[in-house]
Amino acid sequence: MYNTHIYFSDIGIRFGHQQVLSGTELEIMSGRCILLCGNNGSGKTTLLRIIAGLQAPDSGFVNTGIGKYDWNRCRQQLRQTAVYLHQQPYMFDGDVISNLNFSLNSNLSRKQRIDRVNSALEWAGLENIAKNSAKTLSGGERQRVAIARAWLRDPQILLLDEPITNMDQDSRLRTIQLLINLKQQGVALVVSSHDPVHFESLTDTLLQISDGRVHGFNTTDNVTPIHYRKHLHEHVK
């Protein structure tokens, strides 16, 4: 189990004349899931990339428990702590096993690598497609391979950009169950999605991004599924 607790404050970024994020605050904790909602271009992906240390904001501070520092000073630590998964994860040439091997430490012995890959295949339910070419996988299968690669890296924070877009129901359920498993293991999750209702069983905090501002809704404060859906209807467009 991890003991991750990171607080982002006063995050702001502008692209040209558009203020994408302004005064954004975000608290990330082990074993909890934040769901980011908002229209295209609202800043969901930008915020994920800032958390991952991949996109520098114009302003902002990070507190990892040892003090409040400028984002730029914490950039390397964020990159070491978080794994960011793109909406369309890249697959390397070769089969699924080869793709999983890319996530392993090069110092591992051959037996250790085999054991770790086999564990990942079993954990993600990929045994039946282990020898398949990764380039030919369906969208749902690719996403599960990407999550398994992330699992092999032991992330403290996993950031997912639209992870279930264009998936059939079976693939959605499999993917969300993997995320539930990660959350139960203590991984902090931050997910962006246009389909927030599918993440009801996973979400602890629902954040709506609009006009550069983030509005929060804590789903664990005695909130029933009816309240969750009511909030989606009223606030998530």
What name fits each language-model region?
Residues 133-137, 141:
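Conserved ABC ATPase signature
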Residues 61-77:
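ABC ATPase NBD Q-loop/coupling interface
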Residues 158-161:
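Catalytic Walker B motif of ABC-type/P-loop ATPase nucleotide-binding domains
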Residues 88-98, 108:
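Conserved catalytic motifs of ABC-family nucleotide-binding domains
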Residues 111-129:
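Conserved ABC ATPase "signature" region
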Residues 193-194:
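H-loop/switch region of ABC-family ATPase nucleotide-binding domains
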Residues 52:
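Helix-to-loop junction immediately C-terminal to a conserved catalytic motif
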